[in-house]
């Protein structure tokens, strides 16, 4: 349990946590995830690793797919009301992430449930009863709600219900401990109050640091396009790890590897004393993560690819060619999607604007380009990772 305690940003109340551990009983560890996007990022994976650790200590992991709460939208850390997701989109996202999550967690001591199973069945009377478990004053203790209230920014009643629904989830699954990112601490603590309202022993709240995205500034998020997908290729995962700012790699070491905190500190000291180059330490991180997600051979291949393409500036021997349309000017997003470099025009626009597109190693940020400038040129999309997949390297020509 030391592994988890060393990495937790908060354990509240600690006395209750110690009492649960001393009870020697198998505990029910709750983690709720709202399927608001179709992929699993390293940010999600960091928390799922913590849940898996609890399983390895002999406890039961209770994974709640927030198919109901995803329709409401988690207001944590938001300065404005979130857009409402439709149920079809949520169901599609669930179908995408569920198999990935099942492969991360151990099959033994695992329960996966949807909170739609009980929240959708609450009657008006049930909702009134649930609402009476807290007060407006308590809700406004939340920093984000308080800030929006003071700034006269809209707060919908639906947003007030989100943490209540999350708390009711803890009642439904009889959670002993609930884990989550540190931005969830207030919600998890409210869950204690909701459980007490329903005459249950209150859960312990255990939170972990939020993994910062590849931009080095904001938390990893699919909506911000600063994320690393755990289903990406080993080469891309490794390359994206190598692209993160040096100062945040320690968070990745802490949350995404099994190294002891003392071992991570030794790596820090080796850099501080100029014994090691941060770049070399980051290569260790990349190999750790790719090895865990794939295997050691894939990690070695990913590292070799990174060094060949990025450091040695080598390109693949074979580059597919595509015939250019008979037009004077081409709209790059459309072309990149048609020839398979990007999956959609919107993805192409986003990556071009972010400076991730090159024509013969020269960065290009315009959305339109003269056809002659593309002929017999190598088009390279970096996906914000400083390394190109072979499938994202193309040449335009008159074939």
Task: Give short role names for the model-derived ranges.
Residues 194-384, 388, 392:
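Conserved nucleotide- and phosphate/pyrophosphate-binding catalytic cores
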Residues 396-399:
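Hydrophobic alpha-helical segments, chiefly the membrane-spanning helices
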